[in-house]
Amino acid sequence: VNDSRLQHIHAFDVQGDGSITGGRIICHLKDERPGKPDGMKCDLDGNIYCTGPGGVWILSTNGQHMGTIALGGGRHATNIGWGGGDWKTLFITLYHEIACIRMKIPGVPVPRRI
């Protein structure tokens, strides 16, 4: 769960009965670049993609910052989503445009029915 105001990501443990325990901060996304944590998705390897300062942050499953997809020009990412026939296209919404980038690892598909 990301917190836009405090600029960090919490992880929780989901128990067999569906209850949630063990809340902890796994990553602080504070940075001098513009942007805040907002949209967040995962890939099939469990990596976390979260909009944040400077673009889209890519984090390992334990919250280690592995890199940032830089947007440049002071642009702010607001949300992200996986798409394309192979789920390897990451769509990035910004204030006045939509960008996309091809990734090596497919994203977790959104179920059509819940």
Model-inferred region functions:
Residues 29-53, 74-88:
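Beta-rich, blade/repeat-based domains predominating
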Residues 8-11, 59, 98-102:
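Structural motif
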Residues 13-33, 58-72:
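Blade-edge beta-strand/turn elements of extracellular beta-propeller
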Residues 6-8, 20:
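A detector of repeated loop/turn-to-beta-strand junctions in beta-rich toroidal repeat architectures
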Residues 12-19, 102-111:
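Short loop/turn segments immediately following beta-strands, especially the blade-tip
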Residues 1, 12-15, 40:
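N-terminal first-folded block
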Residues 75, 84-86, 93-99, 104-107:
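A short, acidic, flexible beta-alpha connecting loop/helix-capping segment that sits on the rim
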Residues 1-5, 47-53, 59, 91-96:
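Conserved beta-strand positions in repeat-built beta-propeller and related beta-rich domains
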